[in-house]
């Protein structure tokens, strides 16, 4: 059985929990206190971070790597495109999300650190601008890739859920994106994947 070491408030762990519930398979989630991590976390992941996936003698870390492995191991429902060209494009989009959005999410996750106010405001503004630029896609598309739910939707969902929590308010121009977010939030797997700590993040 797969075991996922997951932070109860960690957006990256949230991605992996979401995929596991979408697949509807047997797995175990072990909650990790992000402020008091057990020693074996550093043994399994030299960067000392969660999520970590363990299956027999395989240990994986980094949410996108974990999720692609789960998708290949349990291909139904398929979340990565079957075509190599489309799959490569999705990987580029995932990389873009990390560089353009989630580097700033990481700053916001550290917002309890004093003296970081300017960086926090800059990150909030950058996320707001990038999401607003993305909004017109959803005037036509149900999901990132059209009608089909995919790994791109999984990757961005934890950020969209945390907008209130991070103090990011989007303008009316982002209305199509917010409707798209509600479609994701209504998925049974998304609801199941939420921890009690995450449920209270959104008004």
Give the role of each language-model region:
Residues 85, 97-188:
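GST-like fold's C-terminal all-alpha helical module
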Residues 43, 81, 186, 195-196:
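Phosphate-coordinating loops and pocket residues in cytosolic domains that bind phosphorylated ligands
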Residues 34-35, 177, 198:
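Conserved beta-strand edge residues that scaffold enzyme active sites
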Residues 7, 151, 197:
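Short, solvent-exposed turn/loop segments enriched in Gly/Ser/Thr/Pro and often Arg
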Residues 1-130, 135:
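GST-like domain detector, emphasizing the conserved glutathione-binding G-site
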Residues 195-203:
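Terminal-tail/helix-coil boundary detector
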Residues 29, 147, 172, 193-194:
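A generic structural-conservation signal
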């Amino acid at each position: 059985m797969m075991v996922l070491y997951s932070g109860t408030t960690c957006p990256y762990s949230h991605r992996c929990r979401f995929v596991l519930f979408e697949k509807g398979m047997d797995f175990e989630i072990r909650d990790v206190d992000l402020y008091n991590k057990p020693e074996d976390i550093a043994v399994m992941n030299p960067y000392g971070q969660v999520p970590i996936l363990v299956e027999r003698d395989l240990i994986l870390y980094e949410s996108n790597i974990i999720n692609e492995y789960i998708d290949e191991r349990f291909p139904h429902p398929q979340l990565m495109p079957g075509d190599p060209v489309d799959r490569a494009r999705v990987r580029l989009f995932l990389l873009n999300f990390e560089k353009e959005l989630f580097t700033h999410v990481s700053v916001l996750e550290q917002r309890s650190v004093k003296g970081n106010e300017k960086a926090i405001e800059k990150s909030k503004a950058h996320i707001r601008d990038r999401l607003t630029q993305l909004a017109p896609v959803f005037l036509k598309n149900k999901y990132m890739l059209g009608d089909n739910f995919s790994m791109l939707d999984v990757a961005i969902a934890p950020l969209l859920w945390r907008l209130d929590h991070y103090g990011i308010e989007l303008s009316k121009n982002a209305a199509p994106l917010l409707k798209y977010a509600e479609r994701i939030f209504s998925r049974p797997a998304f609801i199941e994947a939420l921890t009690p700590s995450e449920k209270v993040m959104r008004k």
